[in-house]
């Protein structure tokens, strides 16, 4: 079979009530909110949805325990409320995870301070704490560096292993509500006329065609590119709006003694460091380094990789970790509010809405900051800012993909029977697609090609790729394998997996040899630029692990 991918209709000369620039989690959440309110909404993204900061984060949905140190109780309260909402509505994507706060005799924080902070954290949550068993606590303590006296403090937060999937679901809901969405569509400028933002000049990167749309409101949600959009549009702010902060992570094979809980500790320089179970691997992050370069080309430095490897090696000396345990490293630029001379840890994680009226651009607003946890509440605030009435959260209907428990064997069996696929495949489909999994499974019955695994080492099937192209606005192989069906983030993925996946996907999409080669080459370029293999820096990093 060959899947027909329809060309995208032109946007030229169309009118929208709201144009949202930037397809990360904040932009998608805002577009969804505006569309649900019945406003004609356009969402544009220069690359792919969730390809920026969203897919380069620590992947936790948290109340913000450390925000309490800076007195940001309101932000913690908001974050906890949104965490609980995501746990309830997106239970297949967002799950509780046990955290351990680690202290030793060299830690800057005292045990009393941590105990008081956790007490307040639980009070704000209005939720009884679930604690780890004593045996598991002792097991973790045994594998930590025995040269220190450790104190372990247990609390609960949440993890979204694949925020790319959360974005895909919200995107689907935005379109179902009437939004028009375009990825791989660059904003060349916002046209300002007579003191008002009126039009947006776009370039479709797939066709190379320039298009112009007009809007009642223009919302700049471009993350670390916010200031660039302003500069291109001749909107002059008194100071930069965003202070880009690079956060790097390393992904490691699971090692002996690797915890099933998330660990939260501090490095020698006081920086918080997380060690988390993720995607059958171990995720370690993050750093905070000022970054004024192109956010699209950011990459972890040798020094950052060394720093993170040294940190986790010091925590688990018995594991004898080395460069060879690192599968890859990645980095993203967090769009924190610009604060001259401030320490990174002191910069607020609260979001801000900057109205450009005083700068000669009425009806244009830039969104600064924001995080995975509070994207939905930011969207409601932004919609209200531009005069849109939005329902209270309790009135919002739960959409596709919610209200499923990925551990329910009955649901897994139903999906497996519907698609004639294995229980392992059915479980993976449910965890990534929620209630849509049953429709994808039924589609898979059409042919053996659709039931085939994407690559020999994956339980995810080609039918999920078809769903990505048909309903989730995937355009390239990278859109699919890194974000919609992110199997390429797995522990064993290699260039040979890329080739095998391209062959199987190409057979369904009807690619000829030329198209297959072009798609594969473009994907490998994107994958290797995003997921940096540290083996090329062995001489630097082996010393760090010794």
Task: Report each predicted region and the residues it spans.
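Glycine-rich FAD pyrophosphate-binding loop
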Residues: 35-55
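Extreme N-terminal leader/targeting segments of oxidoreductases
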Residues: 1-18, 33-36
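C-terminal catalytic lobe of FAD-dependent flavoproteins
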Residues: 163-169, 173, 234-283, 290-428, ...
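Dinucleotide-binding Rossmann-like beta1-alpha1 core, especially the glycine-rich loop
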Residues: 59-141
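Flavin (FAD/FMN) cofactor-binding and adjacent substrate-gating region
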Residues: 103-182, 190-196, 279, 318, ...
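Core beta-strand elements of the Rossmann-like FAD/NAD(P) dinucleotide-binding domain
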Residues: 14-16, 207-217
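Glycine-rich Rossmann-fold phosphate-binding loop(s) that bind the pyrophosphate
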Residues: 22-24, 46
């Amino acid at each position: 079979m060959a899947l027909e991918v329809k060309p995208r209709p032109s946007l030229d000369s169309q009118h929208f009530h709201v144009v949202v620039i930037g397809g990360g989690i904040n932009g998608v959440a805002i577009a969804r909110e505006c569309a649900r309110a019945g406003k004609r909404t356009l969402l544009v993204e220069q690359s792919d949805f969730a390809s920026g900061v969203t897919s380069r984060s620590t992947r936790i949905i948290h109340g913000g325990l450390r925000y309490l140190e800076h007195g940001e109780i309101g932000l913690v309260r908001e974050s906890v409320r949104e965490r609980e909402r995501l746990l309830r509505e997106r239970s297949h994507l967002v799950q509780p995870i046990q955290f351990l706060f680690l202290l030793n005799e060299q830690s800057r924080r005292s045990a009393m301070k941590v105990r008081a902070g956790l007490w307040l954290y639980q009070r704000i949550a209005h939720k009884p704490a679930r604690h780890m068993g004593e045996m598991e606590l002792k097991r973790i303590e045994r594998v930590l560096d025995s040269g220190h006296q450790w104190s372990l403090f247990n609390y609960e937060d949440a993890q979204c292993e694949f925020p790319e999937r959360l974005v895909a679901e919200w995107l689907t809901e935005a379109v179902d509500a009437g939004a028009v969405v375009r990825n791989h569509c660059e904003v060349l400028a916002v046209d300002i006329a007579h003191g008002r933002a009126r039009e947006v000049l776009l370039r479709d990167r797939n066709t190379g065609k320039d298009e112009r749309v007009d809007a009642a409101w223009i919302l700049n949600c471009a993350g670390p590119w916010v200031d660039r959009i302003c500069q291109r549009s001749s909107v002059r702010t008194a100071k930069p709006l965003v202070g880009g902060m690079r956060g790097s992570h390393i992904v490691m094979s699971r090692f002996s003694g690797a915890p099933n809980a998330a660990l939260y500790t501090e490095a020698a320089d006081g920086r918080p460091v997380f060690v988390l179970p993720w995607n059958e691997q171990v995720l370690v992050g993050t750093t905070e380094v000022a970054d004024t370069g192109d956010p699209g080309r950011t990459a972890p430095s040798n020094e950052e990789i060394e720093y993170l490897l040294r940190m986790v090696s010091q925590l688990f000396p018995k594991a004898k970790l080395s460069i060879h345990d690192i599968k890859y490293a990645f980095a993203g630029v967090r769009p924190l509010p610009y604060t001259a001379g401030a320490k990174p840890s002191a910069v607020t994680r609260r979001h801000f809405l900057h109205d450009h009226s005083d700068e000669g651009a009425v009806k244009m607003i830039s969104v600064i900051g924001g995080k995975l946890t509070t994207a939905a509440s930011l969207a409601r605030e932004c919609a209200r800012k531009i005069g849109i009435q939005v329902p209270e959260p309790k009135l919002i209907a739960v959409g596709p993909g919610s209200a499923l428990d990925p551990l329910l064997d009955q649901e897994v069996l139903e999906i497996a029977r519907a698609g004639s696929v294995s229980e392992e495949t059915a479980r993976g489909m449910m965890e990534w697609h929620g209630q849509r999994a049953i429709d994808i499974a039924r589609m898979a019955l059409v042919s053996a090609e659709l039931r085939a695994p994407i690559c020999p080492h994956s339980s995810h099937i080609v039918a999920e790729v078809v769903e990505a192209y048909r309903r989730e606005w995937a355009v390239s192989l990278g859109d699919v394998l890194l974000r919609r069906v992110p199997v390429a983030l797995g522990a064993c993925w290699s260039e040979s997996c890329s080739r095998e996946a391209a062959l199987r996907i190409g057979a369904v999409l009807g690619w000829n040899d030329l198209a297959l080669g072009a798609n594969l080459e473009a994907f490998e370029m994107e994958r290797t630029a995003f997921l940096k293999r540290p083996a090329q820096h062995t001489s630097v990093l082996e010393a760090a692990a010794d």
